[in-house]
Amino acid sequence: MKVLKHGLLLLTTVVCLASANAQTVNDIVNKHINAMGGKNKMAQLKSIHMDMSMQMMGNDIPSSVTIVEGKGFRSETEMQGQKIIQVITDTGGWSINPMMGGTPQALPAEQAKQAAGQLYATGPLYNYAEKGNKVELEGQEKVGDVNAYKLRVTTRDSSESTYYIDPSTYYIIEIVNSGEMMGTPVTITVTNSDFQKTPEGYVLPHTIQTDMGGQFSITAKVNKIDINPPVDASIFEMPKQ
């Protein structure tokens, strides 16, 4: 009987600890969503367009991003008078790079799958369960001077990223994930700063620095944000060769 009682006590303790951890994760996620504008605002975000300037290796590069929530992502970057385009959709992806031939190329299925998170302007934490994402709290960890919450996010396709949330603002200040550069695995670190509220009430970072495994970094400055602009779905269709 003692063994049974001890077993039940241990099981109850484990269940309670798991429940407490789940509540803590949801509490952090909810506070993050509130900090970015709130659930109602997020539910109303159907599309977004951002004009940016990127600094890379001393060059100022114009770029833009258009997202239709859950449907399509398109980025355009102008380099040396030529436009590089990358598109991700809910069914795949494609790109055009004039420096590598200039013809539309379908993205490998695995690459398109790993980039599918870019389809969501609301991010992976809003309605994460409905998106098929799993979020786990892994304690706190220093990011600069901030003792940030560390959340591991696993998407439905098993891609993993680590999100660091500032406990004083509940903004995502850093994202770490794995990627490839020239066929070599690298750790990609994205640092968000200069958070500003749009006239519509959304709080978004206006400076985004991406470090490619220490090889080089790109700093994007957001110049303009359009919330819920009309978007022609044809911009996500791969041109015929």
Predicted regions and their residues:
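Bacterial Sec-dependent N-terminal signal peptides
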Residues: 1-25
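Flexible, processing/modification-adjacent segments and terminal tails
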Residues: 21-34, 41, 95-159, 179-186, ...
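N-terminal mature ectodomain segment of secretory-pathway/periplasmic proteins
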Residues: 26-101, 136-137
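Extracytoplasmic
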Residues: 45-47, 70, 130-132, 146-148, ...
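Residue-level detector of beta-strand face positions
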Residues: 49-53, 76, 94, 140, ...
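Structural motif
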Residues: 56, 79, 143-144, 199
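Short amphipathic beta-strand/extended segments with alternating polar/hydrophobic composition
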Residues: 62-68, 85-90, 104-112, 165, ...
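Gly/Pro-enriched, hydrophobic low-complexity segments
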Residues: 147-237
